């Protein structure tokens, strides 16, 4: 274990917390030592406190960890803490941890809108972590203690949406109009109450509370440039990009599918083949940094007319890769395509772990 960074997980008994634990088990750079949950779980061995619902077995390395309350005093030894807390509780707890000088990577929505809190999809906008670097450098220059910080993981469906947009914008310039219709897996709703089986079997639910709004504004923050002083990010304006989302829950276990149409600002627009080549050639910065979990192929361009499909394609690059298919011209905008991403890996806990790997590679933890 020598040389590993000490990690903790908040909300360890929940759906996202369990996924964090799976991804951190036997990780080459992080040692999971502290687990936080509610007061009714505190004091118990993790194996006795959790109702384990992952398809993979509970890692032995986590079974005997004694669960702590979600208070910073129990996490002082941690170099990084991953938060899988529900938004109802995350705000106050994560703020207390940050004020105690602890680094937090959060899956909750509470601080995503804050201009000085990076909202990160690690295969898309790791440069926004310069906000953290600037904060640490400023404190050091002023002779102050090392500050804590919060980094937010994006909404699960936003992660899949922005992944192909980043290389296209870098290559062909701004996208000024974008529509997406999602087909989202039931795992995105978490455990009980989640989505009742009687509601989703033989059915599609054309509503996910708050999801469409999150996709529309998060896209405008993730794709926005850093401020010149690297202290914050402002959302792109409606004049710069218009985003419209419609979100549906479908009877799929894992993997969010999105039907996207987009328009480039610059004329003439690229060709279909140029778009495909751009996506195939994209290499994310996390891979260039040598991060353990980074996908070797960030975007998999599929030529089969009936792909991507969740069951067949969600686990590409261990769930960190994004699959894109059916790329073709759109008679209303410029192009349309189908995008698939693993909602609990690159769309949630896996994104958090890859963010931490980038922080480590940049000596920010």
From Swiss-Prot:
Top-level EC class: oxidoreductase
Catalytic activity: L-aspartate 4-semialdehyde + phosphate + NADP(+) = 4-phospho-L-aspartate + NADPH + H(+)
Active site: 156, 256
The protein's Enzyme Commission number: 1.2.1.11
Phylogenetic placement of the source organism: Eukaryota, Fungi, Dikarya, Ascomycota, Saccharomycotina
GO molecular function, one term: aspartate-semialdehyde dehydrogenase activity
Family: Belongs to the aspartate-semialdehyde dehydrogenase family.
Name of the gene encoding the protein in the UniProt record: HOM2
Main location: cytoplasm
Subcellular location: Cytoplasm, Cytosol; Nucleus
Positions bound to NADP(+): 13-16, 38, 41, 85-86, 188, 343
Entry keyword annotation includes Phosphoprotein: yes
UniProt-recorded name of the protein: Aspartate-semialdehyde dehydrogenase
Role description: Catalyzes the NADPH-dependent formation of L-aspartate 4-semialdehyde (L-ASA) by the reductive dephosphorylation of 4-phospho-L-aspartate. Mediates the second step in the biosynthesis of amino acids that derive from aspartate (the aspartate family of amino acids), including methioinine and threonine, the latter of which is a precursor to isoleucine.
Protein induction: By high concentrations of Met (general AA biosynthesis control).
Pathway field: Amino-acid biosynthesis; L-methionine biosynthesis via de novo pathway; L-homoserine from L-aspartate: step 2/3; Amino-acid biosynthesis; L-threonine biosynthesis; L-threonine from L-aspartate: step 2/5
Keywords from the UniProt entry: Amino-acid biosynthesis, Cytoplasm, Methionine biosynthesis, NADP, Nucleus, Oxidoreductase, Phosphoprotein, Threonine biosynthesis
């Amino acid at each position: 274990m020598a040389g590993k960074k000490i990690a903790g997980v908040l909300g360890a008994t929940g759906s996202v917390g369990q996924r964090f634990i799976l991804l951190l088990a036997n990780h080459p750079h992080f040692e999971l030592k502290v687990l936080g949950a509610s007061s009714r779980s505190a004091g118990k061995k993790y194996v006795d406190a959790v109702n384990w619902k992952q398809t993979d077995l509970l890692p032995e390395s986590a079974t005997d960890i004694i669960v702590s309350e979600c208070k910073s005093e129990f996490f002082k030894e941690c170099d990084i803490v991953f938060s899988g807390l529900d938004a109802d509780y995350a705000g106050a707890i994560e703020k207390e941890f940050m004020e105690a000088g602890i680094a937090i990577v959060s899956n909750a929505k509470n601080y995503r809108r804050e201009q000085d809190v990076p909202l990160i999809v690690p295969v898309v906008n790791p440069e926004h972590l310069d906000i953290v670097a600037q904060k640490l450098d400023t404190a050091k220059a002023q002779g102050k203690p090392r500050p804590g910080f919060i980094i937010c993981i994006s909404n699960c469906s936003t992660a899949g949406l922005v992944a192909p947009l980043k290389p296209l914008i870098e290559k062909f310039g701004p996208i000024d109009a974008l529509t997406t219709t999602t087909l989202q897996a039931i795992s995105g709703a978490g455990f009980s109450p989640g989505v009742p089986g009687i509601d989703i079997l033989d059915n599609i639910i054309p509503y996910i509370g708050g999801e469409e709004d999150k996709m529309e504004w998060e896209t405008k923050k993730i794709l926005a440039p850093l401020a010149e002083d690297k202290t914050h990010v402002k959302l792109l304006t409606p004049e710069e990009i218009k985003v419209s989302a419609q979100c549906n829950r479908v009877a799929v276990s894992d993997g969010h599918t999105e039907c996207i149409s987009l328009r480039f600002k610059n004329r003439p627009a690229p060709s279909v083949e140029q778009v495909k080549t751009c996506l195939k050639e994209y290499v994310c910065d996390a891979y260039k940094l040598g991060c353990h979990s980074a996908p070797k192929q960030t975007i998999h361009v599929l030529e089969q007319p009936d792909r991507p499909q969740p069951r067949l394609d969600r686990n590409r690059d261990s769930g960190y890769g994004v699959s894109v298919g059916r790329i073709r011209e759109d008679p209303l905008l410029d192009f349309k395509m189908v995008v698939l991403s693993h909602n609990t890996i690159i769309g949630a806990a896996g994104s958090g772990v890859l963010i931490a790997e980038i922080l480590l590679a940049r000596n920010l933890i």
